[in-house]
Amino acid sequence: MASSADKILLGKVALITGGSRGIGRAIAAAYARAGARVFICGRNSTDVENALREIRACGGEIDGVAGDISRAQDVQRIVAAALEHFGAIDVLVNNASVLGPREAIAEYPLDAWEEVIRINLTGLFLITHEVLPAMLARRSGSIINVTSGVGRAGKAKWGAYAVSKAGLEGFTQLLAEEVESAGIRVNAVNPAATRTQMRARAYPAEDPMTLPMPDEVVPIFVHLASDASHEITGQSLNARDWLGKII
């Protein structure tokens, strides 16, 4: 684990959705190294347990549960468990998402469309809506929404995923304006191409060795969770701008 001088998130509690794999898991590990107490959720209980075991083995203070953020009852249970375990939520990272089919709109299946929007956009609303009362009561917090380049400029055959990320960008801006006076920051971060399972599904012919690892894109997430970012809100940022920075 990091030395005490490096623990810029000491005293913070972070809830990370989709925290059991890929970028979410890397953020969870980085936050734990930086001194935060971390709570993760993911749909696969085995993945959640593996992530908890790995991060605890490195000395991190972390807990988590399996759950589906597209289901209101699961969201209530996840947030209640985080608050019961750690007493507060200072940072929310909305990372959970699914890709859906890479099909043109004319051929896009309705059931797939509904699933992607339900998880990526309705899930974003549900978890944020459930966490906000705790942040508003403390008049403090940082919400970080994981976006995508296709949410900023739509691309053919990205379907519901691109639309959901465009919605996330709008959600970030309006929420930032609504809660700024309460001391809560809201920003979006685009990790860009990263060596994850989702990227491999989106680009099966791509050589993953040409891409940065999830650990390499986390510095900006640590910064936005820290008090050093207290003046940053309503922004759509790029993780690549922070590649190589020490955390």
Regions found by a protein language model. Name each.
Residues 13, 20-21, 44:
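Conserved glycine-rich cofactor-binding loop
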Residues 45-46, 66-78, 110:
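The beta1-alpha1 cofactor-binding region of Rossmann-like NAD(H)/NADP(H)-dependent oxidoreductases
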Residues 103-105, 109-117:
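Substrate-binding pocket helix/loop in short-chain dehydrogenase/reductase
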Residues 128, 164:
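Active-site helix of classical SDR
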Residues 148:
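Residue(s) in the substrate-gating loop at a strand-loop-helix junction
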Residues 181, 188-189, 196, 205-247:
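C-terminal helical subdomain
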